[in-house]
Amino acid sequence: MNVSIFEDVIKDVDCYVDNILQEGFEDVQVGNDLFRNVKARGVDELVSFLNKNYPTYRPDLNFVRRSPINQEEPNWIHTDEMMGDLTAILYLSKKHPKEDGTTLYYKGEKMCIFKSRYNRLVVFPSKLYHSRNIYDNFGYAESARLIQVCFLKNNI
């Protein structure tokens, strides 16, 4: 299993986040699951970074998600296996609880805990079970948890 952590991925992250917030968010129904406060992104600075650092993969789905406190989420501990081969999560909350981040699991046990940091990117195999560290999310409106997720598929 290969896991990667990158710091300071987006050059002008404050402007990047401002643009995301200005575009707004929407709710998307996928089968029985309702994904709240998401917004699809096209080819952006994160995708360019991933293309450069993962040349044998192609970004398939790229979106941002804002998760205010007590927002119902369709999944807790889950895999993204059906979405791609790698999952990339970019933390975009400038202010966040120290517990914020992502936990990876192996055979039902916590294996690795990533701590959120503004403009930090974590990339891991999509088949791994994982969850956000704070079940109920945090913040309100512009202070809510903000992440960008991109799924990558192997070109080979």
Predicted features by range, described:
Residues P68-I156:
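Catalytic core of non-heme Fe(II) oxygenases with the double-stranded beta-helix
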Residues M1-N75:
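Non-heme Fe(II)/2-oxoglutarate
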